[in-house]
Regions:
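Hydrophobic core segments within long, regular secondary-structure runs in both alpha-
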Residues: 15, 22, 34, 84, ...
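C-terminal beta-rich recognition modules with glycine/proline-rich loops and embedded aromatic residues
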Residues: 10, 213, 292, 358-366, ...
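Solvent-exposed loop and edge beta-strand segments that line ligand/cofactor-binding
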Residues: 2-3, 58-80, 96, 131-144, ...
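Solvent-exposed beta-strand/loop surfaces of large extracellular or lumenal domains
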Residues: 487-513, 532-538
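A conserved hydrophobic secondary-structure block that centers on an alpha-helix together
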Residues: 127-203
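Well-ordered alpha-helical scaffold segments within catalytic/enzyme domains
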Residues: 18, 84-97, 146-161, 194-206, ...
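Low-complexity, Ser/Thr/Pro/Gly-enriched N-terminal "stalk/linker" regions
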Residues: 1-79, 104-124, 162
Length: 641
């Protein structure tokens, strides 16, 4: 059963959890990031992203701009694109003249950096215009274009303004000429433009953009490998160029329909799979969809962390092999979990099965939210499940897994990505087709459907387990609400009367078909009992350990609550207990306690004497809130004794 996500403007958040997160992004995160992109905050990692675009515009107007005036990564433009997209979604919540003015000025500047033929990329315009389109593998021209296409579609949908949409349509036309008529064997080094072209096609109706997206999917990985040949012939490199080309990293080892295992760079992988799933949906390509299902199984059944993190190593920011899920040398990039949400949503649009929304929820409420500090001013790129200050971020094997969030990064892909995901949450929470309105995630606020009814959701999720929807308007239609797999005992009522879930539930959704009337209610009560979770015996890193999950939230132990975390053991057979909601703690949480003990340390490195243990109640907090109280030890998985 196929579906479409709702437009971002169709959802308006209330002052619940999601509403507060969106308010934080709107009032704090976006202005902060805009200042960083303009290099207006001293003492932190320089961005220069908007200045690069200004330099490109000046060069096109005839100013003598030196190549070394460009600063930053080859994909620096994409930081600006993601910020514009996040700002667009924020504007859907209400007017903000100052924010809209900042976006409009940035768009005007970006338009001034576009070449006559539609090409637009500040790195090549400023630094090496003679090398445009000569390094498709590494140079990120298509990646940057894709992100700006997404921004253009978002800004047009929210504001009705076409300037950026026209700029990126011209850019897409340029890309079409280059890759459909000239270099027809090439495909993006970093997938992104595929999913973006599909969005641009929906916004403009231009069939060329869907055709190009499908082309990029179809030619990827065909023999002989394009990237191998390109590297032999191009004569220059973005990076040092000495390493052998890793086709797993570039998602080009096999044609996409032959891929079965998620490999290589995790963000590239899930961005590619998102584009594949979208193309499969819109072209009714069952072979391509079958490949997407195989890749989904590979990730979620064998290569995903309990937190919805993906990518097990900093070596290539990549997937490794099945069940290799180390907790301390993990990568689990924030962008990768955002990309996993993209992929999950597209699979959900192909076939409405609860497992896709379950993973989307797991990724969002754990890894994605952990990627941003509670004040919105610091960010994680990497999301470890175990941290020991002095080792984490210090030892060469642990250098990527930091114990605290930096203010910014030289490679700052994650901060604006979190902002756009939080701001667009409504379009992930709901979807619909001609017959059914789907509630995929629980988000407090009001959502307008195309069925003639409006739903207002009151929920205490994710810390509470109730979600009540009040209907406004009248229509005979179906509302399908997801029953989460983690809820062992769920209660669904319509106008206060219990529904037999066994009779109405299919693939994780309860389907309620009726003549809905003004004032009708649909209420879901979920089981929020905290549970001990055991890992598969195939995961070496978690052998003999357990973690705790309550609802969608994975919990962790932090040193600030428990003293040193490394000596802690959970008592065998202990049951976790949820405490009362603490509104003043970490923005408002429900802590969990579990019985355990702490191993007393010894004076030597090793000893033949058995250690002593003292009983201890272990306090746990939601994983997304960790590292908000200074540098300290943290663990998700705790050994059992």
């Amino acid at each position: 059963m196929k579906s479409e996500r709702i437009p971002v403007k169709s959802f308006s958040a209330d002052n619940g959890f999601i509403g507060k997160m969106q308010k934080l992004v709107r009032e704090e995160v976006l202005p902060y990031q805009y200042n960083i992109l303009n290099d207006a905050i001293p003492g932190i990692e320089k961005s220069h992203a908007i200045e690069n675009i200004r330099l490109a515009a000046e060069k096109l107007r005839g100013k003598d701009v030196k190549p070394d005036e460009f600063y930053g990564m080859v994909f620096q433009d994409s930081d600006v694109a993601k910020w514009i997209e996040a700002a667009a979604y924020a504007l859907a919540a209400g007017e903000d003249p100052e924010l809209e003015k900042a976006v409009d000025e940035t768009i005007q500047l970006y338009g001034a950096s576009q070449h006559e033929d539609g090409y637009v990329d500040s790195y090549f315009t400023v630094k090496c215009p003679d090398k445009m389109w000569t390094n498709i593998c590494d140079a990120h021209e298509l990646y940057c274009a894709g992100h700006m296409m997404e921004a253009a579609v978002a800004y047009y949908e929210v504001t009705g303004k076409r300037e950026l949409l026209d700029i990126m349509s011209k850019s897409a036309d340029c890309i079409y000429e280059q890759f459909m008529k000239k270099n027809t064997r090439a495909y993006p080094g970093h997938p992104e433009v595929e999913l973006a072209l599909m969005r641009l096609w929906r916004a403009t109706g231009n069939e060329k953009y869907k055709e190009l997206a499908k082309h990029f999917v179809d030619v990827r990985g065909q023999a002989p490998n394009y990237f191998v040949e390109e590297k032999k012939n191009r004569g220059w490199n973005v990076w040092d160029g000495t390493e052998e080309l890793n086709t797993d990293y570039t998602q080009s080892t096999l044609p996409v329909r032959e891929q079965k295992d998620a490999v290589g760079h995790a963000v590239r992988a899930v961005y590619l799979y998102t584009g594949m799933a979208d193309v499969a949906k819109e072209t009714q390509d069952e072979t391509l969809l079958a490949a997407c299902r195989n890749l989904w199984e590979s990730i979620t059944k064998r290569r995903m962390y309990i937190t919805g993190g993906i990518g097990s190593t900093f070596m290539g920011e990549a997937f490794t092999v099945d069940y290799d899920l180390p907790n301390d040398t993990v990568y689990a990039e924030t962008c990768a979990s955002i990309g996993l949400m993209f992929f999950a949503k597209k699979m959900l649009e192909n076939e409405h099965r609860g497992e896709y929304a379950d993973v989307m929820e797991r990724a969002f409420y754990n890894t994605v939210l952990a990627g941003m500090q509670l004040d919105g001013k610091r960010f994680f790129y990497v999301n470890p499940l175990e941290v020991v200050p002095g080792i984490s971020g210090k030892a060469v094997t642990h250098r990527a897994a930091l114990p605290t969030r930096p203010q910014w990064y030289a490679c700052a892909c994650c901060p604006p990505n979190v902002a756009r995901m939080v701001s667009s949450f409504g379009s992930y929470a709901y979807s619909e087709n001609d017959d059914t309105f789907f509630i995929d995630l629980y988000a407090g606020g009001t959502v307008k459907t195309e069925k003639g009814i409006t739903l207002t959701c009151e929920t205490d999720f994710p810390h509470g387990g109730t979600a009540k929807y009040t209907i406004k308007g009248e229509a005979e239609t179906t509302v399908a609400i997801r029953i989460p797999a983690w809820s062992e005992k769920s209660l669904l009522t319509v106008n206060g009367e219990a529904v037999d879930l066994n009779a109405v539930t299919k693939d994780g959704y309860a389907y309620i078909t009726r003549a809905w009337k003004d004032g009708d209610t649909l209420a879901l009560t979920m089981d929020m009992t905290p549970h001990v979770v055991y890992a598969s015996a195939k995961i070496a890193a978690d052998s003999g350990k357990v973690c705790v999950q309550r609802g969608a939230l994975v919990y962790c132990a932090e040193e600030v609550d428990n003293g040193k975390v490394l000596p802690l053991y959970v008592k065998a057979g202990a049951e976790p207990k949820a405490l009362d909601f603490e509104p003043e703690t970490l923005g408002g949480i429900v802590p969990v306690e579990i019985a355990g003990c702490a191993q007393q340390d010894i004076d030597t490195l090793y000893s033949t004497k058995a250690p002593k243990f003292v009983e201890k109640t272990i306090r746990l907090i939601p994983y997304y809130t960790w590292a908000n109280r200074g540098e300290n030890q943290m663990r998700v998985w705790l050994p059992v004794k």
